[in-house]
């Protein structure tokens, strides 16, 4: 399932990030910790964005990007 569909406040493991055409966006996600094996938690949704907890930080990502991040419930 993709990250945009998960319930709030539950932990998920990133299993795959589908192809992102913009290299700078891909690099930014990588630098924020969005890599295979990382644990993420969606803490809220607001105006088409998700607030995600990853590696002890909270970051906002758009649903378009969240749809490319495939996760499994842990």
Can you annotate each of these PLM segments?
Residues 10-25:
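Short, structured beta-strand/loop micro-motifs enriched in basic residues and often containing a Trp
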């Amino acid at each position: 399932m993709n990250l945009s569909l998960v319930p709030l406040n539950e932990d998920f493991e990133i299993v795959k990030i589908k192809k992102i055409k913009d290299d700078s966006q891909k690099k930014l996600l990588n630098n924020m910790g969005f890599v295979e094996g990382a644990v993420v938690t969606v803490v809220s949704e607001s105006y088409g964005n998700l607030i995600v907890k990853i590696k002890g930080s909270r970051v906002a990502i758009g649903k378009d990007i969240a749809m490319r991040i495939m996760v499994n419930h842990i």
